[in-house]
Amino acid sequence: SLRSVIHFTPTDFEMLYLRSDLYENDREQARKAKRSFVDNERLGFDSKETYRGLETDPDSEPDIGTYEFTIRVFSEGFISRVIVGDQGIILTTDGLDLASFETVAIALRVLLKEL
């Protein structure tokens, strides 16, 4: 199930959702804890440019397609990141199957494009 939703840019972030049983529902404590995740996921702004360049590089992995989203797997949950332009969304979850991650990522990409 969904644990948290964070909107972020290269310079700031906002927690849009926090499941009530986490961090004793203390949003400030959660924000402090999530800062390290956000700082790490901001690296995606740079790596996205790298992956975009690989799309046109004839020496890169053939037919790998366009970068869409990132999933990080932990023993007790997942972090998923979607970046469009200069903003992104991080989701933390207890678990989802891969098809559900992809469905959510597509929806988030559409939403971010509209912002």
Predicted regions and their residues:
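Non-catalytic interaction/Regulatory regions outside core domains
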Residues: 1-115
